[in-house]
Amino acid sequence: MAELSYEEELRYNRQIILKAVDFDGQEKLKDSRMLIVGLGGLGCATSQYLAAAGVGHLTLLDFDTVSLSNLQRQVLHTDSRLNMPKVESAKIALQQINPHVEIETINAQLSEEKLAEIIPHFDVILDCTDNVDIRNALDRRCEQAKIPLVSGAAIRLEGQISVFTYEPNTPTYRQLSQLFGQNVLSCVEAGVLAPIVGIVGSIQALEAIKVRLKIGSNLCGRLLLIDGLTMRVREMKLPV
């Protein structure tokens, strides 16, 4: 396992003093490889907290470019990087947040076959997309490789998060999509208030760290539903 430098020990001190993390946990984070699919609002929030927390390797996957309408909620991107690939814009910002993190980018829309090739090389996959087909492809390939998937969604003032570990007798994303159907609106059609993507993305980062360090109780088998308009949070048990 990779050892922490003195500078890293200082940087991550407030995490290391947590009994659930300690030096072993921080070193495990440094050894970790995570794939973030989608560098929009959720991906920006998720990736900055994973980078700041000291996840040693992040691969960013997206095929889109930065547009002006993104800047209201996609906090890693800036006016000076309009029309730049989102993965490259995010990489610049994340390297400024934490230069100790290795960041790779994939500026492409990968086929399901290509996803099947790369997913086994990661410890956790984070689904930060707003595309049902991509979500289902990630679910199938993560299930095949038995790699945990942390899925989040945000629209209007509402958010939802769940974790899929693919252990025996646990649900998959298919069960979730069957509950809500395939005709899911995007924020382009329905709108989204900026802070809700930050809330959901931050929880995704938290769940990814918990899954990787095997601490606490993650959202496997449960769907966390957040209503930002009323500030009510509820939980739904997912069918197996």
Would you name each region that the model predicts?
Residues M1-V240:
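Adenine nucleotide-associated cytosolic modules
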